[in-house]
Amino acid sequence: MLSPNDKKLEKLDPFYLPSLSKQKTSAEIVSEARNALRTVRTQRPFTPREDQRKLFGPASSRTPENRPPSSFSVHASSFEFSDSRPISGTRLSPLEFKPKAPASPDTVEDFCLSFPKPPVDPAKIRRISSARARLFRVASQGALLPARTLLPTQPTRVESEETVTTRDSVVKINGIYLTESKAIGHLKRHPLQLTYDGDFSKITEQEMFKGATSVPFHLRSGGDQGKRRPRASSSSRSPDQSRLDIRAGSKADLQEKNTEIEVDEVFWNTRIVPILHDLEKEENIEMVCATCTQLHHALEEGNMLGNKFKRRSVLLKTLYKLVDVGSDLLSLKLAKIILALKVSGKNLLNVCKLIFKISRSEKNDSLIRNDSILESLLEVLRSEDLQANTEAFLYCMGTIKFISGNPEFLHEMMGKGAVEILMSLIKQVNENTKKSGTCLPNSGHLLVQMTATLRNLVDSPLARSKLLSINALPQLCTVMEQHIGDKDVCTNIARIFSKLTSYHDCCVALASYSRCYALFLNLINKYQKKQDLVVRVVFILGNLTAKNNQAREQFSKEKGSIPTLLSLFHTFYKLDLHSGKRWGEGDERPEARRPAQAEDVLIKLTRVLANLAIHPGVGPAIAAHSHIVGLLLATLESKSIDDCEELVINTTATINNLSYYKVKNSIIQDRKLYIAELLLKLLVSNNMDGILEAVRVFGNLSQDHDICDFIVQKNVHKFMIALLDAKHQDICFSACGVLLNLTVDRDKRLILKEGGGIKKLVDCLRDFGPTDWQLASLVCKTLWNFSENITNAASCFGDEAANTLLALLSSFLDEELALNGSFDQDLKNYHKLHWETEFRPVAQQLLNRIKNHHTFLEPLPIPSF
């Protein structure tokens, strides 16, 4: 006899998919999403690698006459010598120079030192550099050096009788004459002396002033050099005295400057001139390159880099002449020094062109890396004026673009701040464009190079992190808005976003920028037939709408969003119909092929539609849109799974999501039988992904009585029962959902006994129950519907199945046993949620029903007579 509770259970309606009007738990929402609504994945559009390194690739929208050249010649004559002069208030006369060491003091200018032979020892040179620094300090403290005369050809040390402070007594330090009073102050601060051969000696004041020489006539300025004038107090100074102090200060500044110049002359003649002499006479390229490296180090040590060095013009002329040698390695060495000397204008352009020309050959990447040319190029971008050097920046960025495609440079570029530098330039271009109200000349060409470089860099996780930290994505959107007429720029940024939105954090960042949706729609409308750009924009939209319901809503609310997608769908559906050869029956199909261009757009587009359909406010509208549904069905009709697997699967997934909505004006519901006919092709294919999508659609459609009749008439139910043996959880889940809907109709419950359906359901419960409580719940609901009119458990399910069900259900309803899996805490919570809300209620009801209609008495043996 049934208990009151059991009688209530007996009157329950058959288990069915939850009603839309019912308030759903979170578990039900997850369950429904698994049943009916799901996002669609796809691959990022394929970008072929360019065979040649050029400013603009073969797919560029720029015509040859409307873009800067990638091929050109750079010679010594290309450079301007006028730029070689140092920046100063005085215009300097050109210097004639031959990189040959002077033979004697008579052959050089009167202010130059003769350089000693042999060349100075490197250890001594380092000491010279230290002495130069001390000399600067002396000058700043008032021990100013007057002009000097030519020095003796051999280094000498002044040693004679003790110093006596007289009018004409002087001391020579580092080849420069000083009065004794100044020299004493110098020695107190700096006990080291630099002799002419670059050596230092420890000396005392007494040694220093033994045998003071006479000041040459041209150094004498009158007055007692050994006496100091008492300094008047500030309170007693007269205006005349103040003017005298100012003049004295100006004179001191001039003397300090002269001192620096003379110290530079010492370094120039002892270090630089011998190297230039070697450059002139050396014929071996490797030795010339080594000498260039030596020259760069010497210039750096002597603080002679930059654009203010007096001898810069002589140096640059020598370097320019060596460009004609034509060696790539030598040219890179020269370019690095020239850039370090801060050339400008045409010379900056030519040196950037020179490096660009070398970088076009991939085999030179190792040379560029070994010489750290990247650092010099980034310094150009960081320090030079963008508007004044746009063309130079163009070729500089061209080189950086080339090497950014080499993974070996990725770490170096990240470490040297390449991402930040590029985004700073892009922001500057945006601001200049906004300020002027129009795109500046050549800015588009430059943006192509910068965005192509960023496209290569975003493969690095560090680059993506930096872009997010500096809020770079809105800046890139602004570039697209301002240069929407430049297809090359827009395509590069679309490629950047294609990569970035494949990562969740970047996808969220772009989705939160509300202006991006209208921008992407404008791009689709403007470049509707430009497949390489459109396919990426649609791919980006698919990423944005994949897991973000707010993005789905925001995009759908943009003016013309659905009509734009419809127009694009229609355009590429027509293109696909008329493109390429259709495979005939006798044709041998390749095992795998890349989708055609039109197919690829359709793949990405159907994915966007499938994702949008998940939103409850958008899905019903699309399901009621006759043109969109018509194109989906036409695609499914014209394509087989062998023609284009991804397109067929995505189209079926979109139909599945749309079939979830039971609205009056749904085109899906109106044409459900036609859709069921189309799905039969997928069910009999050998593609398990295609079969799974078809079964999912049948899971939604089979809630309709007409579809249930169709399933039985076409023997689709037998196929569903067979799929229970697939040992694939998702396939078993979807097939069980169809069988559950069939058992709602009392007339169709007996079909579960065909093909061993009951046993297979019990096997699914045993195999997948402990790891998939949603699937276990579906199995129990199906068996509950099937056993509504049960009188005996053994006759209803069969003896073996009934006993197995009793054992399984009793075990699975024991919480300790059921949830004792080796899962992490999050997964345990997930399993417990579904076990408590979905499995336990129906499993307990089914167990009670079986117990109440099951006898545990064993049959007696038949007596023998």
Swiss-Prot record:
SMART domains xref list: ARM
Family annotation (InterPro entries): ARM-like (IPR011989), ARM-type_fold (IPR016024), Armadillo (IPR000225), ARMC2 (IPR038905)
Domain of life: Eukaryota
ARM repeats by residue range: 261-300, 303-343, 362-402, 407-448, 461-502, 505-546, 550-587, 589-614, 617-660, 662-703, 705-744, 746-788
UniProt KW Transferase keyword: no
Biased composition (Polar residues): 60-75
GO biological process: cell morphogenesis; cilium organization; nucleus organization; sperm axoneme assembly
Protein keywords: Differentiation, Repeat, Spermatogenesis
UniProt region (Disordered), positions on chain: 39-75, 214-243
Function in brief: Required for sperm flagellum axoneme organization and function. Involved in axonemal central pair complex assembly and/or stability.
Protein name: Armadillo repeat-containing protein 2
Organism listed in the record: Bos taurus (Bovine)
